[in-house]
Amino acid sequence: MLRLRFFLVTLGLLVLWASPASAELLALLNYESKPGQPVRREGIAIMEIDPESADFGKILMDIPLPSDLVAHHIFFNRDKSKAYITSLGKSVLLAIDLTRFPYRLRTIDVPDCQVNEDLVVSEDNKTWFLTCMGSSNVVMGDAQTDRPIKTISASDAAAFILYPHGIAIHNGIDRVLVTSTVKPDMSDQGDTVTVLEAKTGKVLSTHQVASKPTPAKSAPVEVMFSPNSNPPVVHITNMLEDTLWAGIWDPKSKAFTFAQVDDFGAKEQGMPLEMLYNKEGDRLFVTTAKTGFVNLYDNSEPRQPKFIKAIASAPGAHHSVLSPDERYLFVQNSFLNLEGMSDGSITVIDLKNDKVLGNIDTLKSAGYNPNCIMLLPNHFQNSGLRANVHLH
């Protein structure tokens, strides 16, 4: 059983009650040792990332993880009362009840899922879908009990699931989309997106998302629905083709059409990965791991986002989060511990002036790479975390 352990002496953890006026901007960062370290370690750090805080860059809490878990991404359910951590190394999900403190890790067995990647939760907060890149299937689960309820696989030429990674859901049109990315050992690459029926998990159709004929090996990696778009529009990052695509929903035919909307290769960038939208949905941010940029788009027309500018981050630019007031963008710079794409820092960008304020090197300096960054929801309005945790 995985247990949450607090090293009160060695880590110097101290929890204090703070006044409501004590503003905090806390991030969850799962991390792992950089290559070549004598002892491999994984964990989840809770870090203060507010540039105006006296605790900026400090780790307030550290939650150790098994060193062979290979924790990958962090996802929330719809009300952000629960966090899920996917694992590349084991057929398990980890869950944290964010409304209970101290935080406790709970293991969810998903035996049909190998190399679990991304997770989405239905809009009614009752069902989750988990992509399994190693076993080429998708697992549906009960989001209340966190028990798997259905394993979805398909091999028909017109509707199949192969190396699924990215996933997006829109219950308004009863659709789930999953990308076909790469075989975990990188010996094969996909070039398609598959559409599922959200209520049943029925596999409906598969569509090529690439500028060349199959096998294009474009490796679509992430797919997201653009907020507030009517008709619904998805955006897709093609990791190995270095392009951004859009899928537009047709209410009459109840089908998507797909088209390329930007080319990162022309910008001398490679490996587009994650996407992020602001609250209004009129801004889109796309990271590229080579050589490390975040691209800003005017997303007023989601069917054709307009490129505004690229801001240099660091090699391995991957996940990003916005501060609640959308003044700051934080970019986590590490991609699978890969050489040349694992800087290990967190870049802080001032969006008011479109400039880099600096980097948080806390994990990097200790010999670790962050794998994901998410803002920690505040379910304790009158409390705060204060600590000075040193990683060894």
Language-model segments: residues:
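Bacterial N-terminal signal peptides that target proteins for export
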Residues: M1-L8
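Predominantly soluble domains enriched in secretory-pathway, periplasmic, or organellar proteins
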Residues: G12, S22-H392
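N-terminal signal peptide c-region/cleavage motif recognized by signal peptidases
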Residues: A18-P20
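Hydrophobic alpha-helical segments of integral membrane proteins
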Residues: L14-L16
